[in-house]
Amino acid sequence: MARTTPLERMRNIGIAAHIDAGKTTTTERILFYTGKSHKIGEVHEGTAVMDWMEQEQERGITITSAATTCEWRDIQINIIDTPGHVDFTAEVERSLRVLDGAVAVFDAVAGVQPQSETVWRQADKYSVPRICFINKMDRVGADFYHSVDTIVDRLKCRPVPIQLPIGAEEKFLGIVDLVEMRGIIWRDETMGAKYDVIEIPDDLKDKAKEYREHMIEAISEHDEALMHKFIEGQPISNDEIRAGIRKATIALQIFPVICGTAFKNKGVQTMLDAVVDYLPSPLDVPAIEGLDVDDPEKTLIRHASDNEPFSALVFKIMTDPYVGQLAFFRVYSGSMKSGGSVFNVAKRRNERVGRLLRMHANKREEIQEIFAGDICAAVGLKTISTGDTICDDAHPIVLEAIDFPMPVIQLAVEPKTKADQEKMGMAIQKLAQEDPTFRVYTDPETGQTILSGMGELHLEIIVDRMMREFGVGANVGKPQVAYRETIRKNSEAEGRHVKQTGGHGQYGHVKIRVEPLPSGTGFEFVNDVTGGRIPKEYINPTEMGIKEALEGGILAGYPMSDVKVTLYDGSYHDVDSSEMAFKIAGSMAIKEAAKRAKPVLLEPIMAVEVVVPEDYMGDVIGDLYGRRGRIEGTELRGNTRIIKSMVPLSAMFGYATDIRSRTQGRGSFTMHFGKYEEVPAAQAEEIVSKVQGKTTR
């Protein structure tokens, strides 16, 4: 079966923004106008097509990024709707990794908000070209020009308006198209499906002329032919302007700005035009780089072509109630037929693809073959996880894995009955496969199952899904901070595990050096044993013993990280040595070495941004200081203050209720993980004695 859509007629885009900026509503309107959905879904009514999990429909937020395909002007657009809540940052990171372009949605009243900055930084990391859509132009206080200023100030980039609004707030009627120099007014009675092209209103003519000059100047800076025409005052055609905007956008030199109100059905078609005209096709972005499976130093290149070997990256795993596990992936090169076999690089095994599905939010269409540039879902891949590369087994390649942040918050869950215990095990396994920022472990002291994640909302939704989708009855504890441990100085120690009680004994003896590593590095193991003092087959078990001991912590049972361990000497016994003996010796050695290396407790510090009316600023800042917070700065926006601070997570539980009562419901805040820092001695002592008190009882 041959390809039906040429690569240059494809767009893989994401819609990303701050929570409540209107991403899902925007996507719903796109589906309506491209003819994919016959009734518009509303987020606040809980009927949005893209928000298909019960938890999403209840809360009116998007948790999973649903992938959808639609068409506009004969161009196939694959859209991924991403969550804007900071607890679901991993979803955004994952979807940006596989996209070629994005529409960044901003609220016309608030402009750039904290999560907008996070999403923007993630898009910068993956060099994703973006269009800025200033949404909610019909809201009271909507200000297009202020929003553009916040993009300059807070995102430190170059937004270039290619449209201007006609009116604002309830008088927002349409837009001025600066390329065609015409006005567009939407008709309310047709749900915005039809619009009238008008002359630019008199009061906007001068402004439109001025902004068109700015636009042409911005694009001609990156195009010599245009620059020459611009300086000479020669006429520049609309097609040349469009080509110039496209070139500068794909090169990340400018970010075109458009506006509208998705909820009131204004500006969506012109946004689709901008997606088609200015965002890249898979051919416009650099070829994907990967690593050689056998030689990680060697870089391999895969071009977006059906003739290259097949390679794809799995960016999402979901459990569908009807077809079972779905693996969403982006094809970078080659093609694959339904029922074919693929090589899973991470698991080093071949797997058969049962069916290939093209998703339309929660409806699915079966397809026979997929090609370079496609985004689709597969059924039947048994051992697949998020971030895995699947490829042609004759030409293996490792596409860049996706880095996910460490969880910062945890809670204990206990199944109510024996039957619940089995169900819970299965539910947790499936949920962890879908979401790599959700981790699970069993507390060795209490035997409780501990779930850890990116925030209170993240864990609340996981527990909710566990109970609803998998029918698990469970008692849930209060959220707690995920502390960590590390060391502050070098030390040495030896571990000797010797048991000789007649017959087959046990003998393992190791000597190690430990040293602290920079924050965020993790664990490093170096084998420096020479002269066969420890046989090769015992090196791995020694490392395993060390790793497991560090996972269990030294001070207070929290995982220890940022440690380098060098195994430099030891001894063995021909008969009595075993893998288990060396594993135990490794564990003994690291416990002793870590105790001597000044172990300390680390806590997650959150970047907290509080938005309050000016009158409450003093009180709120005083309260943040009381929570061991550091104020990083404040800025004035209208008559509200934005307070930026770094506060320990342990001091932030219940802050949502507290800030509301402190500001009579007028204050709000957002927070995301900043970094791990050492806990002050007094607090550390309290935490350690609390943990040790529990274990001695």
From Swiss-Prot:
Location of the tr-type G domain: 8-283
An example Gene Ontology biological process: ribosome disassembly
Alphabetical UniProt keywords: Cytoplasm, Elongation factor, GTP-binding, Nucleotide-binding, Protein biosynthesis
SUPFAM superfamilies from the UniProt entry: EF-G C-terminal domain-like (SSF54980), P-loop containing nucleoside triphosphate hydrolases (SSF52540), Ribosomal protein S5 domain 2-like (SSF54211), Translation proteins (SSF50447)
Keyword S-adenosyl-L-methionine: no
UniProt-annotated binding residues for GTP: 17-24, 81-85, 135-138
Annotated GO MF terms: GTP binding; GTPase activity; translation elongation factor activity
Location (main, coarse): cytoplasm
Highest taxon of source: Bacteria
SMART domains (UniProt xref): EFG_C (SM00838), EFG_IV (SM00889)
Subcellular location: Cytoplasm
One GO CC term on file: cytoplasm
Similarity annotation: Belongs to the TRAFAC class translation factor GTPase superfamily. Classic translation factor GTPase family. EF-G/EF-2 subfamily.
Role played: Catalyzes the GTP-dependent ribosomal translocation step during translation elongation. During this step, the ribosome changes from the pre-translocational (PRE) to the post-translocational (POST) state as the newly formed A-site-bound peptidyl-tRNA and P-site-bound deacylated tRNA move to the P and E sites, respectively. Catalyzes the coordinated movement of the two tRNA molecules, the mRNA and conformational changes in the ribosome.
Protein name: Elongation factor G
Organism name: Solibacter usitatus (strain Ellin6076)
Gene coding for it: fusA
